[in-house]
Amino acid sequence: MFSAIAKRVFGTRNDRALKRLRKRIEAINAHEPELQKLSDEQLQAKTDAFKARLAQGETLDDLLEEAFAVVREASRRVLGLRHFDVQLLGAMVLHDGNISEMKTGEGKTLVATLAVYLNALTGRGVHVVTVNDYLARRDAEWMGRLYRFLGMEVGVVVPRQPREEKVAAYQADITYGTNNEFGFDYLRDNMAFRKEDKVQRDLYYALVDEVDSILIDEARTPLIISGPAEQAGELYEAMSRLVPRLQAQKPEERPEENPELGPGDYYVDEKARQVYLTEGGHDRAEELLREEGLIGENDSLYDARNINVVHHLNAALRAHTLYERDVHYLIRDNQVVIVDEFTGRAMPGRRWSEGLHQAVEAKEGLPIQAENQTLASITFQNYFRLYDKLAGMTGTADTEAFEFQHIYGLEVLSIPTHRPMVRDDAHDLVYRTADEKYEAIIADIRDCVQRDQPVLVGTTSIEASERLSKALKDAGVEHNVLNAKHNESEAQIIADAGRPGTVTIATNMAGRGTDIVLGGNLDQELAELGEDPDPAEVERRKAEWQDRHDRVVNAGGLHVIGTERHESRRIDNQLRGRSGRQGDPGSSRFYLSLEDSLLRIFASERMSGMLEKLGMQHGEAIESGMVSRVIENAQRKVEAHNFDMRKHLLEFDDVANDQRKVVYEQRNELLEADDVAETVDAIRQDVVEKVISEHIPPGSIDEQWDVPGLERTLKEEFGQELPIQRWLDDEDDLHEETLRERIQGEIEKAYRAKEAEAGASVVRHFEKAVMLQVLDKHWKEHLAAMDYLRQGVGLRGYAQRNPKQEFKKDAFAMFQEMLEGLKRDAVGVLLRVQVRAEEDVEAVEEQRRQEAERMQMRHAAPASAAAGAVAAGSGAAGAAAAEGDSAPTGGAQQQSAGGRGQETVAREGPKVGRNESCPCGSGKKYKHCCGKL
């Protein structure tokens, strides 16, 4: 109550922030009359004047008011669009490095020009980030006219672009591109073999369009550059044959207090997106695996040697039970194509990690593509935090304001609309069954069509959109479908969606970034007439459009129908936001049923009881604010759970990110250096010193020395045959310190002889090539080992250890081990390999170029069922498994924590029966403790 009173008296934090910014709008407007008097040349000269003032010590804040006024005047002349005062407000928020929440149709693309121009004056490059290549090209071309008028260079980066074009795009003042392309270019730059191969400059200012989609929805999906790893197609196929022979447990067979009761072999927890084997299911699975010859006669699933089998069984169970065709993926060109759960778009090239994608391919009887080993990866959370300054804009960010602040340090400010919002958002209608719900939706659509009112129907899956499409066909209602299967004609469908009586079915937010104009898109119609259209035809088209527009307005504007609530309120708000743009009339309503996923999982019992008490008949619906609040509370639960997942992932990924920064910094120093001889000499002396200490401990007596072992190591690892034992036999006064100096001196002499033979310049070139290649090799193996560690560390929670602290401790130890290993490896290569000419160095670089050609760029979709659903049942293990959702494992399952291939592990103690007490001392049975699958 007190907070409500305080808000009324003092205003909200948002109100106070906007009030402070509004004072500057008057100053911006005051520049307008004088700027209108300037010629084009005088207006264009302002850019150089601003740059000169910056060079003299003024700040961007000092220039803001006049610079914004210049952009507004230039936009009026070039684009015929003048920025509203609320758009100036939004741009100031963007310049301050925050998030501007502006409703659909408020001109976010135009708002961006103000902040982008101001920050581009520094000459350090501004990146404008969009959600797809179409929008990047469109905005670069559309707004590029304005920037070029003001003397700014504009570039656009897209996939498969020639290197020269990409370099030019990044050298431009303003660069448009997608989040994926910017991220992949960053990773590729940090794998470059020559500094000339790098394309990006330092990361200065990023302005992210649809910031909620990129920084929230895709936060758990890392960008991965990978190479082919070991193929295990036969094992995936065998598991796919085995899973249908296991019987699913029905919900009524497993009471809440004892979920392992019942005859089934496994049960599916839809809320947690997990699959668990029952006690009988373990025995049945072992029996089937023995039949297939996948485990030994006396083996169990618990044996360490079978961890790979468990991994594949887990993937197959998830593929068969949690992932449905035409809901979670499509089959296109004999390949599994993932469908984005947030936008409903197909995502070619993206693959689930942890073997899930291969398991789905096996389930569908498709060719199984090789698993990939991660060469480099980064999450969007960590990539965008590399920029000195980050800002974003969207129509729906307020519900995630805490996460933006907590993770990225970005404030969300809601900008008022230019015209008042008049859309009518009706209460949800809740039906008992999906059939009743669809009957009501079709009746509503028929009513709208009869009144010439356009309808946009939002569905949560391709399956739902096609079910509704079939029902409309049967009812004789013409309509357009916009989903991942029909995205080629997306722009045309969206352009026509505002015409009188048009019905458009779209999955979630397909078509986001394109406005639905009431009456249809007039600009597109006029553009189709060509460069020199007949004026009479233009007038006729305008008159037709005006007539259509008026009919739609009189019918009530665009009517939005939601067929199901999404897990996130923000996605629902985006769907509603398609209607009522810029003060247009409009309406929206969600139709729900107790069979919908969200209600079935989170709110069904309470809601079902409520409807039963009301004695509802077939076709009756309940409509009340109380029902809407129950649904909103369910959504809040899911949002909180998803936020915890993203936060959990970030805490783990921050460890890898700190290591990534160190490795990339060292790599860039190597790349930039013309001569790394000093570094190589220091590393060689350090490595040789440690090798000597392994066999001759410092301060030890002669009897403790392992001279034969030292001679063998120097010969096998470093190619140096030194008669150390003979030296000791021949020279009585050769003690430890002088022996160390002599070994170092002999190795130094051998290296200098090699240098003299090949030439100093050739050896310098070779040193750099070897250092880069060895660093990349060890970093790749370290990434695989880190993923392996991340998947298993949750199990330590059973031993009352904190998995996060354990991960940090082990990851640090592994990183130290990697650094020592790469130094030793590099010294070994440099001492062993004979380099006689520049061609030998070129051969190393050519090998590297061939490896680069085999690399694959992919945006790893999170495997919604957590990693190790079979291997980690609940508690800390389950939490870690959930964290491992999107871990880019690739070939990690073939790697041990040290990066070596899998080995058969001998059991150290006696075999523990499943019903015996757990050896950890917890007092629980083994199957309920450390042996829990």
From Swiss-Prot:
Q: What class of enzyme is it?
A: translocase
User: Quaternary structure?
Assistant: Monomer and homodimer. Part of the essential Sec protein translocation apparatus which comprises SecA, SecYEG and auxiliary proteins SecDF-YajC and YidC.
Cofactor or coenzyme needed: Zn(2+)
Q: Where is the composition biased (Basic residues)?
A: 924-933
Q: Where in the cell is it found?
A: Cell inner membrane; Cytoplasm
Which positions bind ATP? Q87, G105, E106, G107, K108, T109, D515
Q: What is its EC number?
A: 7.4.2.8
Q: Where is the composition biased (Basic and acidic residues)?
A: 845-856, 905-914
GO MF terms held by the record: ATP binding; metal ion binding; protein-exporting ATPase activity
Organism equals: Halorhodospira halophila (strain DSM 244 / SL1)
Its placement in the membrane is given as: Peripheral membrane protein
Instruction: Write the protein's name.
Output: Protein translocase subunit SecA
Please give one Pfam family short name.
Answer: SecA_DEAD
| The UniProt record lists the keyword Cell membrane | yes
Q: Which domain of life is it from?
A: Bacteria
- Sequence positions that bind Zn(2+): C918, C920, C929, C930
Family classification: Belongs to the SecA family.
Record's keyword terms, sorted:
ATP-binding, Cell inner membrane, Cell membrane, Cytoplasm, Membrane, Metal-binding, Nucleotide-binding, Protein transport, Translocase, Translocation, Transport, Zinc
- Specify where it is mainly localized: membrane
Q: Where is the composition biased (Low complexity)?
A: 880-897
